[in-house]
């Protein structure tokens, strides 16, 4: 069976800020092969700067590798493929929320994707908040500055779940 993701010979470098040579690079990811199957839960661990976040951004199709192959369901996947990018969503450790209400934060991605029907927006917002343990009656109109750090993380997760992605990276 074809894996959901197949990564092969992935290399990602960044400019080396410690070098005086303006062309010097630092390799942060050098991955020979990785298969991720549908439904699989996979943990990635490593030291700071070992490429964990870079790998997640490559899998989420937000950042291209310098070299190597990324396949999604057996077909080439790149950062320019909007359809594939919408199948995957990434929640970073320190999520960014808009300086707006919880409802606006959760609705933002839905609106970007063309969902404008008020009833559908309300249903998805409420369902995703409930899924992360936040009562919509209590949290819907709260603003970012009124939330604890953990509540901000839950709102960010609710925003991702509302999109109904096939793949959720955290």
Predicted regions and their residues:
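The feature captures the beta-strand-to-loop junction immediately N-terminal to the Walker
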Residues: 45-47
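Helix-to-loop junction immediately C-terminal to a conserved catalytic motif
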Residues: 60
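Conserved ABC ATPase signature
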Residues: 143-147, 151
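Catalytic Walker B motif of ABC-type/P-loop ATPase nucleotide-binding domains
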Residues: 168-170
């Amino acid at each position: 069976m074809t894996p959901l993701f197949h990564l092969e010979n992935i290399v990602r470098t960044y400019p080396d800020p410690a070098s005086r040579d303006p062309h010097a690079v630092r390799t942060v990811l050098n991955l020979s092969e990785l298969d991720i199957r549908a439904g699989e839960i996979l943990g990635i661990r490593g030291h700071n700067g070992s490429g964990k976040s870079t790998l997640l951004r490559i899998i989420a199709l937000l950042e291209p590798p310098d070299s190597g192959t990324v396949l999604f369901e057996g077909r080439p996947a790149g950062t320019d493929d909007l359809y594939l990018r919408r199948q995957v969503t990434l929640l970073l450790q320190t999520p960014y929320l808009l300086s707006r209400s919880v409802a606006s934060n959760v609705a933002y991605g839905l609106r970007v994707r063309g969902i404008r029907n008020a009833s559908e927006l309300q249903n998805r917002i409420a369902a995703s908040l409930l899924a992360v343990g936040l009562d919509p009656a209590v949290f819907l109109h709260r603003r970012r500055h009124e939330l604890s750090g953990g509540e901000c993380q839950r709102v960010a997760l609710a925003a991702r779940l509302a999109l109904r992605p096939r793949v959720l990276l955290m």
